[in-house]
Amino acid sequence: MAADIFAKIGDIKGESLDDKHKDEVEVLSYSWDVTNTAHIPSGGGGGAGKATFQDLSIVHKIDKASPKLLEACATGQHLKEATITFRKAGKGQQEFLIVKMNDVIITGVVQSAPGSEAGSETVSLEFAKVDWEFKPQKADGSLDAGIHFKFDIQSNKVG
């Protein structure tokens, strides 16, 4: 399924001209890892460990947001929130995945420009709270109610 992805990172303005996501960053790719140190020994008696939340990363073309993203990273600026929105491309343009983060810090900006291609950068975000919402598609093509994963990383609690 083709998707458009947009990032609203604090008050940093990107180059999106989209009506619903004007001045946001147009995202090329997204990644985020959550792991758990659970251990299941032979004979049973295993237990869950503590979840480890890696930085969420996006890749986008170098654009007018780049200097401000670099500045926020270099200064350790705290951003109130950031939102990554995935939208089905084409007619209807339904937003099916929304990742909202609170108390955000940009922990890395890695720029690259292989060969004669235009440059891109990977921006890494660390955050204190996340609300990850997915809206499944129904048989008629509309979206169902959102299913949430909400987690307070600082207190290590769901919700």
Specify the residue positions occupied by each region the protein language model found:
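Glycine-rich, low-complexity intrinsically disordered segments
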Residues: 1-159
